Amino acid sequence: MKPIHKKLLSSLLFLIAITLQAQERKDTTLMREISINGQRQRISYRLDRQQIDASQVLTAQGGTALDVLRAVPGVVLDAEGSLSYRGSQSFLVYVDGKISPLTGTEALQMIGAANIRDIEILTTPSAKYKTDGDVGIINIVTRRAETEGWDVSVNGMASTWATLSLDAKINYRMGHHNIYVGGQGSDIHNKSQFQQEKFTTAGGASARSFADGTRFRNFRTYIGQGGYEFNTGWHRLAIDLQGGRTINPRGGDMLYETELNPNLSLGEVMDSHDRYKLTKYLFQASVDYTWKLNERGDEISLSNRLRYDRFSEEYTESNMFNLAGERMEGTRGYETEHHWDCDGALSYKLHYRPQGILELGSQYTTYSEEGDYRICYWNLPTQQFVWQDDLYAPFYYRRQVISGYAQVNDRIGPLQFDAGLRVDHLIDDMDLPTITSRHKRYTELYPSAHLAYNTTKAGTFTLGYSRRTNRPGIWKLEPYITYEDYHTRIIGNPDLESEYIHSLELSWRKTFGNTQVTATAYVRRRTGVVDYVRRAYDVGVTLDSIVNAGNGWRKGLEVQVTTKPAPWWQLTANGDLSFHNFRATYEGCISQHSTTGTVGWINNFRLAKNTALQFDGHFVSGHHLTQGWEKAYVYFDLAARQTLLQGKLQLGLVAHDVFHTARYHSLRTQTFLSSETWVRPTYPNIVFSISYHFRQPTAKAKSGALSNEAEFVGKDF
């Protein structure tokens, strides 16, 4: 273990020891959620998940679900704003229990933090959930109207990075009926300074190239939503409609300087401008129906979701000019496609005893994509772009998954458990008539189990296990070259196999007076690890191809301590220390043993009744890549929130990376290639947000009459 990691671990353990000694020994551990001196915890726990209270994360103001998750140990955002958790960027995203119309980081950026009540992380999901996702499922629980009458919310934000966002939602609830309509428009920007040095050898020639400039990545969303809910307690019907457009551009503006062999003479300085844009016009409809069969609580549920992208286009553009402004090279790539996918589920819950539930279900998922890929190159003699007909590639892809599962959940005294088994039958078809085809049929089993034991003195222990997979989508399988920039090209792999994961974790949590301590040890075994491998493609040009790089173990420990040193100050310290063992099975990848970790120091201050301040410090240690290493860095965030008009209006101000210390420095090395990259986010990044929430309850709601989701106190209770 490196000295810096020893110091971090020692500091964290020392903090735990001090806080435990300083507290009373009276235990107040709860199974579901814990509050300290009446203040809801930032992170609470259930049998199979941890839950983050978005309202407690001030640094997420004006941000998205991505910013809320920064509070979680083991969460890291890279230089381009993509989220990884426990070393992986593969996870499923749900919104209110339904699969998101987008995936990964894009799905997290689609939901504004002001509209989020909680975020749930399921690292070992039960058998009733889909099996995709290396580190599990992230479920975003949005804010819902809880009383009868009108509920209106409006949220806006702007930042020094030219990020803008505005959303609004109107909800009306009356008796058994609830109607809502809303919309959002956002333009999220990510800017950074970029430098890279590469040494490549290809075809007997060598080159050392230098790049210096700026890179950006934006995410624009324009989505409308509406729905209707009917709930009598015996019958529940929910209809939700969403539609709109998403645009995801990224690119860079660089100066390139190249030295060529044999004497590494200095080449001409070139001016490069590269662009990528993914545009989608999407529509999604979902219908859910639940029928409660008896007073015991047995029920039948039926759900269906349909998503259709009537138009989706991936556009890539590379441009190379000399300093006189004359075009020397260039490409234009177009991948145009139509998507449609559908999910259906039928389940039956049997309460075979007061604490016991048996759930049986079947699910069906189908995803289809049809389109073509075209590219044209700049012809220097004719001074025009020329279509490359030999590279034209039409494609068709369809994946179907037919699933069945059984799961039991029960409680015996202080012991709570669930166990389940899922069967997936997969049908995978891909046809690229001009290149290749892929047809697969197979059936797999995915077990899961969770166990929780609650004691008065020792606290609560939970144990969870699940088997999961990462199945490659078509964008990872497409065997034609696309351009990230003129010196970096990417290609898919039609022979790519699925990655399989076994996840096991053991957690302990206990409250001592004003202090809550949580510790989680986890193990994750991955076979057929999917990752990009970089190799020399041409003189000064690299090619990133996606492969099954090898097998790996990740063993980690997460610790979080939350305490109140003073009535106006809540302190949370958390850390993640993991040991990674990767054994390469693909030529060009490097077997590695490494230790990585993160440390967070989160301070919440109550300056006045309606004024709050938050100051965070985060350290991210160095971590391995399949071909190299990324170095450690540290950053600090500062946020303030002011509440006005009896809680209806909130003003927020957030300064990210306030001391400008976040720097991303990575190295990749293999035969015939070495590269070193430096990325530094643009400074400053200051966000201003405003939120207005108005409720107008009906006369019936004001009188305290019973309704399904009302909250009651005093005599009405």
Where are these regions (language model features)?
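Short, acidic, small-residue-rich periplasmic hinge/interaction motif at the N-terminus
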Residues: Q23-L58, D78-E80, R86-S88, L122-T124
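Short acidic/polar hinge/loop motifs at secondary-structure boundaries
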Residues: A65, K98-T123
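N-terminal periplasmic accessory domains that precede
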Residues: A65-V68, E106-A107, I121, G133-N155, ...
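Extracytoplasmic beta-strand/coil segments of soluble accessory domains associated
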Residues: L66-I99
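Transmembrane beta-barrel wall of Gram-negative outer-membrane proteins
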Residues: A162-N190, A205-G251, K277-E295, R307
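Outer membrane beta-barrel strand-and-loop segments of large Gram-negative receptors
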Residues: D341-D343, V386-A393, N493, E497, ...
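Surface-exposed extracellular loop regions of Gram-negative outer-membrane beta-barrel proteins
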Residues: I427, Y453, K457-S503, V523-D544, ...
